Amino acid sequence: LPGHHRVAEMDDEENVPKPAIRDVRKVNESTLCVTFSDDTKCHFNSVWLRDSCTCTACVHPATRQKLLNSVKIDPNIQPLSWAVEGGETLEVCWPQSTSSPPHSSHYSCDWLYQFAKLFETKDGDPPEVSDMFYTNTKSSTILWNRDEFDENPPELEYKTFMEERSGLKQMVKNLVKYGISVLHGVPPHEDELEKVAARMGYIRETGYGQTFDVRYNADPKTHLSYTGAGFSHHTDLAYRERAPGVQLLHCLKAADPAKCGQEAGGKSFFVDGFYAAQWLRYNYPEHFKILSTTPVMFSFLDAERERWFREAWPVISVDYMGKLKDIHYSLFSMRPPLLPQDKVATYYEALRLFAQRVERTTLQYSFYLSPGDLVVMNNRRILHGRTAYDPTKVDRHLKGCYMDLDELKSLYEKMRKDDAL
């Protein structure tokens, strides 16, 4: 699969000479063209350059919040002068109000060069920039299937996670890279879930409260997950205005399949939705485009509170650069898309291709949850579910909660930065 491994630690090319600024010239009233030592050229808009200044007058040195008011920049601004310092820095002098002296901005060659690669990209995946204002550097995801986790599962011990900094870092690294991490040896007590969440950040409360229980409930109005029915691949709460980024599930009770027979069911499975989406993108690009541009309604009746929740998302979401961002997938809350009738068949064909790939056993990381297991997963990347089980044979009780994904991503970024100091 192209793009299968995007390991952030290997993103620095060795033995490649650093670029230098060779020439800067004015192309027109609003544009400077920078030529680099490898003959790369890039056009930079003057308003964009002025807005990108990071001096202490434009960006607060401690909080890194912008002090420069973007909307007050003259849309017709032109540089008064510019100079290149040793091929490494471009200095540009900008006009200000009549009562203020010109403003001087400095842009490093490395900084300009990475945007040159981004702005001039015509085909393929655009490169990431390493500017902290735009991206969590060193955060590339690693796509996976069952074979990868058979050899190296993203698992660690509860004691290591709770007591050692390296354990905490491994947990959030697994989540950022693979979208999933599994703790073993968590005490099977109801309050342990909140302790695990607090070790990383804050619980996100939902209509189910701070935490919720997943266990058999004979009430016919109950959620499907509270029955013994099979629960197919899905992401949670796609019908909310913003589906939670992270889900935690702590197993408090589970029958031993060796004692009750595996036919009793209740086996959990997890699939990398990004892997399936990337496969679709490379093998069926038109179908990928359909699933990434067609909003579909997700809706759910909270029978206990008698409230409907509705939100529309494409099954596959990409960011402004075309990179995979989110998966929203839940066949029991997805409604038929509202499309012109001549486009319906192709939509369902695209959905079928994605579903068939997701359901392949070669993509599934599956196991029987045991008391003391706790799964942490990216809820907008990892599709999860379970096989049907017989509630007369299997006493199954999971405790769950949600968190915000950016809390954990920012924690990992900080820990990496601290380790580099």
Regions found by a protein language model. Name each.
Residues 1-161:
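Motif-centric detector for short Cys/His coordination patterns
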Residues 135-180, 184-421:
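Active-site environment of non-heme Fe oxygenases that use a 2-His-1-carboxylate facial triad
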